[in-house]
């Protein structure tokens, strides 16, 4: 009787141990990845499918702005995010003290200038309102694009984080309107033109190759990335996540789905 009890207890404890081990293994193989809506979210759905074949489960968390995904990653609410370019990450690390690092390049979204009021930049009238993102890196990116198009000039040392205060020549006296990047597509009726990040443009139904009246050179510093906490860089799931993103399936999806508006960077 006692022997049967001991054997039964041992079996129960063994099963419990196996269950606990399985639970831990499952937890280690499931990660939460933050994205913004539009192409980033669509691409991550394909990454999720590929990763699952290699034992990595991805839970996608979608955000509607640029600030929260890094805050959530730094606080431990996410394991990774995929929505930003490296200059933005570096600015956030410097300004907020986040211990976040870049682990892989993903895609490039050339920024475009859009308008519902003019068909070319040459048609912009003196005093025209131009909307640009209000965060330092994307705002600077927009101003550099406007400079490239000959609409204004910036101080030579303004760099990637240029602000309207760095404008030294503005022949048409353009009025720069700084808005949250995600909200700019909604402002097109209220401004004469707007510099819009491609992910937000596409989410709003705009087609960069067809609708932009000017577009950024894709061979710039604004390659999008996957970011993680520095402390997690040696965890096994990191390599699995990168391999899934850099898979032929994802590359084919990007090329067929976005028709050159989004460009793979690996």
Predicted regions located by residue number:
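Ligand-binding "clamshell"
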Residues: 91-103, 116-118, 190, 195, ...
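A conserved helix-loop-strand patch within extracytoplasmic ligand-binding domains
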Residues: 103-152
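Beta->alpha turn/N-cap motifs
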Residues: 38, 62-66, 76, 81-90, ...
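Short helix-initiation/N-cap motifs at beta->coil->alpha
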Residues: 60-71, 158-186
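Periplasmic-binding protein-like
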Residues: 105-114, 138-147, 202-266
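Pocket-flanking alpha-helical
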Residues: 66-97, 112-114, 119, 139-142, ...
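Short, well-ordered beta-strand elements
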Residues: 28-38, 56-62, 129-130
């Amino acid at each position: 009787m006692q022997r049967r009890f001991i054997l039964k207890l041992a079996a129960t404890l063994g099963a419990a141990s196996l269950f606990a081990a399985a639970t831990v293994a499952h937890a280690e193989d499931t990660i939460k990845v933050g994205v913004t809506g539009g192409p980033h979210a669509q691409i991550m759905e394909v990454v999720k499918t590929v990763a699952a074949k290699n034992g990595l489960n991805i839970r996608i968390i979608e955000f509607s702005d640029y600030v929260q995904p890094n805050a959530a990653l730094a606080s431990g609410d996410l394991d990774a995010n995929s929505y930003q370019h490296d200059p933005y990450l570096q600015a956030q690390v410097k300004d907020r003290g986040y211990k976040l690092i870049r682990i892989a390049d993903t895609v490039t979204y050339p920024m475009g200038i859009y308008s519902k009021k003019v068909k070319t930049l040459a048609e912009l009238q003196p005093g025209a309102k131009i909307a640009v993102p209000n965060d330092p890196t994307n705002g600077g990116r927009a101003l550099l694009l406007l400079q490239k198009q000959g609409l204004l000039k910036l101080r030579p040392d303004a760099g990637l984080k240029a602000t309207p205060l760095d404008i030294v020549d503005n022949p048409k006296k353009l009025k720069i309107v700084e808005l949250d990047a995600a909200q700019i597509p909604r402002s097109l009726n209220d401004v004469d033109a707007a510099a819009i990040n491609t992910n937000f443009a596409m989410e709003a139904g705009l087609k960069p190759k067809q609708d932009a009246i000017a577009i950024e050179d894709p061979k710039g510093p604004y390659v999008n990335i996957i970011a993680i906490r520095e402390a997690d860089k040696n965890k096994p799931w990191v390599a699995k996540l990168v391999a899934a993103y850099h898979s032929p399936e994802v590359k084919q999806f990007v090329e067929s789905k976005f028709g050159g508006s989004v460009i793979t960077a690996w």
